[in-house]
Regions:
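Conserved catalytic cores of phosphodiester-cleaving nucleases, focusing on short active-site segments
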Residues: 66-72
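Non-catalytic C-terminal interaction segments of nucleic acid-processing enzymes
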Residues: 1-64, 75-170
């Protein structure tokens, strides 16, 4: 694809937001920070992905290629690795079976907080770290930690780069 066509397609990015993301003030602020037009639709895995329009008008849903699974805290992530592990693993297994990449974005988290047990759940730091690293190895999952005020920008950057890589490889 020609660089001009790539730029045209990148200008058409629409952020896809899973319908299970609760319509809160925080979501509205996040969407504003993402900066792309947004569309709510059911995603098979993850909370955010993208859709682009190719130069000839064909819409391409990239949610089968990549998605971003957002967690608002280490505590929410820990629940996904403990009480909700079966459901969470199924979501990652679906993505892996489709060859999709999942970014696990955890707000207000760091490895230092995980290793130091600076969270409110009862899961031990070793168990939580082991689960996170096991998911990374098993599902080729990429964890990203950021402050909640940066989440929209991080999502925007992931979407833009994934869309650009997709277009450059057409």
């Amino acid at each position: 694809m020609h660089p001009v066509e790539i730029e045209q397609a990148l200008a058409s990015i629409v952020c896809l937001i899973d319908t299970r993301e609760q319509p809160t003030d925080a979501l509205r602020e996040r969407v504003k920070a993402i900066g792309f037009p947004a569309k709510r639709q059911k995603l098979n895995y993850g909370d955010y992905s993208a859709e682009i329009t190719l130069p000839r008008g064909e819409r391409v849903d990239l949610s089968a290629k990549f998605s971003i699974e957002r967690k608002m805290s280490i505590d929410e992530m820990a629940a996904c690795f403990t009480s909700q592990r079966e459901r969470f693993a199924r979501e990652f297994e679906r993505a892996k079976a489709n060859g999709a990449k999942i970014y696990l974005l955890v707000e207000n988290a760091s490895y230092e907080k995980i290793f130091g047990g600076r969270y409110r759940t009862k899961v031990t730091p070793n168990a939580l770290a082991a689960s996170l690293f096991a998911f990374m190895a098993r599902y080729d999952c990429t964890p990203i930690f950021c402050r909640d005020e940066s989440t929209g920008r991080v999502i925007r950057e992931i979407i833009y780069r994934e869309a650009k890589e997709f277009l450059q490889n057409l």
